[in-house]
Amino acid sequence: MKKKIRGTKNRPRLCVFRSNKHIYAQIIDDTNNKIIATSSTLVILSEQNKKISNDCHAAHKIGQNIAQKSKALGIKKVIFDRQNKIYHGRIKALAEAVREEGIEF
């Protein structure tokens, strides 16, 4: 059974989705139903015209990117939503990169 995680205005939700090829991260304000910031391997791929693989290194880069975007918007604390995936591998790499950039959850 899946538990619903909801963010607040002061503490939005960092939602992570992992597919076989890509990883996506979104900062969502659930009170207004708005996506505040987003980052994925597809966005980084199109910006840099480089091939980013689906490994932990790519997840670390996405974590750094979403953390920089959230700091630019003044967001210091988030609620981490890993969508019932285990805290391991790419999910863990993304979370650690976000924490290294100074975002708390």
Swiss-Prot record:
<keyword id="KW-0689">Ribosomal protein</keyword>
<keyword id="KW-0150">Chloroplast</keyword>
<keyword id="KW-0694">RNA-binding</keyword>
<comment type="subunit">
    <text>Part of the 50S ribosomal subunit; contacts the 5S rRNA.</text>
</comment>
<keyword id="KW-0699">rRNA-binding</keyword>
<keyword id="KW-0687">Ribonucleoprotein</keyword>
<comment type="function">
    <text>Binds 5S rRNA, forms part of the central protuberance of the 50S subunit.</text>
</comment>
<comment type="similarity">
    <text>Belongs to the universal ribosomal protein uL18 family.</text>
</comment>
<dbReference type="InterPro" id="IPR004389">
    <property type="entry name" value="Ribosomal_uL18_bac-type"/>
</dbReference>
<protein>
    <recommendedName>
        <fullName>Large ribosomal subunit protein uL18c</fullName>
    </recommendedName>
</protein>
<dbReference type="Pfam" id="PF00861">
    <property type="entry name" value="Ribosomal_L18p"/>
</dbReference>
<dbReference type="GO" id="GO:0003735">
    <property type="term" value="F:structural constituent of ribosome"/>
</dbReference>
<keyword id="KW-0934">Plastid</keyword>
<dbReference type="GO" id="GO:0009507">
    <property type="term" value="C:chloroplast"/>
</dbReference>
<dbReference type="GO" id="GO:0008097">
    <property type="term" value="F:5S rRNA binding"/>
</dbReference>
<dbReference type="GO" id="GO:0022625">
    <property type="term" value="C:cytosolic large ribosomal subunit"/>
</dbReference>
<dbReference type="InterPro" id="IPR005484">
    <property type="entry name" value="Ribosomal_uL18_bac/euk"/>
</dbReference>
<dbReference type="GO" id="GO:0006412">
    <property type="term" value="P:translation"/>
</dbReference>
